[in-house]
């Protein structure tokens, strides 16, 4: 079966990465001033929006459907990023960071 570019865009273009889903959500991420200058230059998604804040941090808003690949990209920024919204994504990242920290007991 042939699939048109428009159909592909409809299914894959609104989500994040290669993972698709039914409901499109919006992630709001705040990057530290140290990471801001690098992240502001990155293209995470064709429909992303970003703004440099007065304190030097950078806020990135990005659409996603399935969080799998987005969580991986968030995690690579470690302590330089905070998930502001949605709460479900914030909790997923918090759990992953807690599990990672447990690998390094005092």
Task: Briefly describe each language-model feature range.
Residues 8-106:
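Polybasic (Lys/Arg-rich)
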Residues 1-6:
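Short acidic, Gly/Pro-enriched loop/turn segments at secondary-structure junctions
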């Amino acid at each position: 079966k042939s699939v048109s570019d428009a159909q592909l865009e409809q299914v894959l273009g609104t989500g994040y990465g290669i993972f698709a889903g039914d409901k499109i959500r919006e992630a709001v991420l705040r990057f530290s001033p140290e990471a801001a200058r690098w992240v502001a230059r990155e293209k995470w998604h064709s429909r992303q929006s970003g703004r440099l804040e007065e304190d030097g941090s950078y806020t990135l808003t990005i659409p996603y459907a399935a969080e799998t690949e987005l969580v991986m990209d968030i995690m690579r920024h470690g302590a330089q990023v905070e998930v502001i919204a949605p709460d479900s994504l914030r909790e997923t990242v918090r759990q992953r960071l807690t599990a990672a920290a447990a690998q390094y007991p005092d």
